[in-house]
């Protein structure tokens, strides 16, 4: 049986400073697809220079945007990455082994986060199991605009090898990112008729980070 062809899909918005390393780490894939939502920093041009197929799509929210990318891919097996993530060499080896003889339709991998130059391999933050490799005929992204997840019609297997995640390099960048996420979460709660205290929205990400 021949190996299953793989598409790596990445959604982007002004990610030029991070994307090149991500694309280089995914160069083993049969296709790399970048779905961009109107970047103004040369992200789309950079992706094309690295051999990626680039599609423009207005922002739909994280879940729907990622599912659009999955459906636009040319292959059924997809690996979903963020622009600030890298496929480590051990993970690449395991992915290729899985594609040679898939035993499941979806695979989670350990994600290792780096904050301010330090890899966080202790506490709650590691291994941050992330379901990113799957056969799109048996799995899809949820429609959630934030805190999206992959929904499958079968069991999820695990593979070794770190997915490397470069988080914000500065505390200011980290807090800015958390502010954007909590704003989106607050809007979702409001639309659902729920209320969350300001203290909870502000402290939850900080308390979680303190456990790393």
Q: Over which residues does each language-model region extend?
A:
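N-terminal/domain-start alpha-helical segments
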Residues: 1, 15, 29-30, 45, ...
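N-proximal low-complexity "stem/linker" segments adjacent to membrane-targeting elements
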Residues: 1-25
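Short beta-strand/loop segment that forms part of the nucleotide-sugar
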Residues: 10, 29-38, 55, 83
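Acidic helix N-cap motif at the loop->helix transition within catalytic regions
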Residues: 20, 41-50, 90-91
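A conserved acidic beta->alpha catalytic loop
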Residues: 25, 36-46, 82
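Conserved donor nucleotide-binding strand/loop of the catalytic core
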Residues: 44-72
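Catalytic-site signature of metal-activated, phosphate-bearing donor transferases
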Residues: 63, 67-70, 76-77, 81, ...
């Amino acid at each position: 049986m021949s190996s299953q062809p793989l598409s790596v899909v990445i959604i982007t918005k002004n990610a030029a400073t991070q994307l090149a390393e991500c694309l280089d780490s995914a160069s083993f894939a049969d296709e790399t697809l970048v779905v961009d939502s109107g970047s103004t920093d040369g992200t789309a041009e950079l992706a094309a220079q690295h051999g990626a197929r680039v599609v423009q799509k207005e922002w739909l929210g994280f879940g729907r945007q990622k599912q659009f990318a999955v459906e636009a891919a040319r292959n059924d097996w997809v690996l979903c990455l963020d622009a600030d993530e890298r496929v480590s060499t051990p993970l690449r080896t395991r992915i290729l082994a899985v594609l040679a003889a898939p035993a499941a339709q979806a695979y989670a991998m350990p994600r290792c986060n780096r904050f301010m130059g330090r890899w966080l391999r202790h506490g709650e933050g590691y291994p941050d199991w992330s379901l990113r490799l799957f056969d799109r005929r048996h799995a899809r992204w949820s429609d959630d605009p934030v805190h999206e997840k992959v929904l499958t019609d079968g069991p999820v297997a695990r593979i070794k090898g770190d997915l490397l995640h470069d988080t914000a390099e500065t505390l200011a960048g980290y807090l800015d990112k958390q502010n954007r996420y909590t704003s989106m979460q607050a809007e979702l709660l409001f639309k659902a008729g729920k209320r969350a205290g300001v203290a909870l929205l502000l402290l939850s990400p900080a308390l979680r980070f303190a456990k790393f």
